[in-house]
Amino acid sequence: SYILLALPLLLGSCEAYLDVNPKSEVTDKELFSTAEGCEDAIYGIYTEMGTNKNLFAYALTFAYPELMTGNFTISQSDNLAYVVQRLWEHENAITVAENLWINGYKAIGYVNKALMHVLPKSDDEFRHIRLYKGELLALRAYLHFEMARIFAVPFASGDAAAKAKAIPYVTTYGIEVTPYSSLDKVFELIVADLTEAEKYLAADEELVTATRDNASDGFT
């Protein structure tokens, strides 16, 4: 009986403990409770994409694509050298692929986490909420396009089995494992995200004051 009486107290203590956050940390609920927080989250995703060498700071910009086309050579001490030589089973080539895969889907996870908080919000809550939604959906489509570009076979491939199992197209944030989609389905989902993003981003002209005519003047 003493145990039963004490149980609610213990459970209450656990809930109180789980609700306590270090002063230096900001919870997701707090972060996405303001427009500035939403923007910080989006900036954070761009920062991760732009500074991570396993993404656009190196691997996905000039390194992996250019080396695969044979435009440049690379030191044998770099793991990418094994990719260039098509030594796919070598542990160094596997490391390159794993890093690309893990960091690419980690970035997609950040996007989905932000969308989880942003999509339910109405226009009345934040002035630019439609732009946040559109930008995040476009980012999700773009990141999946990059993953398909690197890891999936091309449309022209005759390998039906490989095309049937291209990459996972992840649209939720959580511990659930997303199954692989076919190449056709991946691009169907990319187009769907971009179409939805375009609808939201159409609010740009209404919400953002800017000179839009002759934007290319001065460029050759």
Predicted features by range, described:
Residues 201, 212-220:
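Aromatic- and glycine-enriched pocket-lining scaffold segments that form the walls
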Residues 50-55, 70-74, 143-154:
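Secretory-pathway/luminal and periplasmic proteins that interact with or process carbohydrate-rich
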Residues 79-151, 176-184, 198-202:
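Conserved, well-structured interaction surfaces
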Residues 142-173:
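Extended ligand-binding groove/face enriched in aromatic
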